[in-house]
């Protein structure tokens, strides 16, 4: 909530994080029906003349932005790690493809099916490796942990959506029914690409952090740019339009 109304104050120092308990003035005006993850309720809350005691302040006064940014690291990493649970859908589809027969043989013998399994398990293992890498970076307070967590959240949740759909594709029409839990997994996993920051926002954070690492980081690695045969041809390294015209005009 807004606690500092001084317009000259930095925007990150204008809000505070508080815990609002259920009581007079706190109402749920609308409950949303959800495509998936129906175990958690989602609704529109309305606060009318609600008083919050100072003891319900989370962190320091006016430090709500700091609390939010600190909270996003574990939230996004949790989203990434939870996405690895899509392994269950792949396992169900893999077992099904071994039992289901078509044209006299298990459908796993058709590359159109088995290659979906190969792609899916590769994506799953790659995502798992990135999630563990990001978790290790957070534990070690590594300077690139914010980027790695954003990458893990984006990559793992995209992977989960793709793998869940591959599992349904392997199983065909029966995967679309509630005889198997694949349809539920597909509905549930879709939210992971949206909550705790959409994957488009993750791209924004990733590129920002990586540019900062490359452009502001120390040049302690070998400068591979100097490996070019014409490494000293500075006149040919056109960075702006004027450089291009100057080179071509001789």
Describe each model-derived feature in a short phrase.
Residues 1-28:
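A short core secondary-structure module
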Residues 17, 26-125, 150, 192, ...:
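Glycine-rich beta->alpha junctions and the first turn(s) of the following alpha-helix
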Residues 94-105, 121-155, 168-171:
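C-terminal helix-coil-helix/basic helical segment that borders enzyme active sites and/or dimer interfaces
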Residues 1-4, 76, 96, 100-102, ...:
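Short, cationic motifs built from Arg/Lys/His that form the positively charged side of catalytic pockets
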Residues 13, 40-42, 187:
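Short, solvent-exposed loop/turn segments at the edges of secondary structure
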Residues 71, 89-96, 133, 137, ...:
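Generic, well-ordered alpha-helical scaffold segments in large soluble proteins
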Residues 11, 60-61, 109, 141, ...:
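Residue-level signature of the cytosolic catalytic core of signaling kinases
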Residues 37, 143, 147-246:
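Alpha-helix capping/hinge segments and adjacent helical runs
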């Amino acid at each position: 909530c807004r606690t500092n109304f001084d317009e000259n104050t930095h925007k990150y120092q204008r809000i505070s994080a508080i815990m609002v308990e259920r009581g007079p003035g706190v109402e749920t005006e609308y409950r949303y029906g959800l495509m998936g993850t129906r175990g958690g309720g989602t609704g529109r809350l309305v606060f009318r003349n609600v008083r919050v005691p100072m003891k319900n302040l989370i962190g320091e006064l006016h430090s709500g932005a700091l609390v939010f940014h600190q909270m996003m690291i574990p939230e996004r990493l949790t989203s990434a790690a939870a996405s690895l649970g899509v392994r269950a859908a792949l396992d169900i589809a893999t077992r099904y493809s071994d039992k289901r027969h078509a044209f006299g043989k298990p459908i796993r013998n058709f590359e159109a099916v088995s290659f979906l399994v190969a792609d899916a398990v590769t994506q799953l293992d790659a995502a798992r490796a990135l999630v563990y890498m990001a978790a290790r970076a957070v534990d070690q307070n590594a300077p690139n942990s914010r980027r790695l967590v954003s990458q893990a959240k984006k990559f793992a949740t995209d992977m989960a959506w793709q793998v869940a759909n591959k599992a349904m594709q392997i199983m065909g029409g029966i995967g679309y029914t509630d005889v198997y839990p694949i349809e539920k997994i597909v509905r549930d996993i879709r939210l992971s690409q949206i909550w705790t920051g959409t994957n488009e926002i993750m791209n924004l954070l990733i590129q920002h952090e990586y540019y900062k690492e490359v452009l502001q980081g120390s040049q302690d690695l070998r400068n591979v740019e100097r490996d070019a045969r014409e490494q000293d041809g500075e006149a040919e390294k056109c960075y702006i339009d004027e450089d291009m015209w100057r080179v071509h005009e001789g």
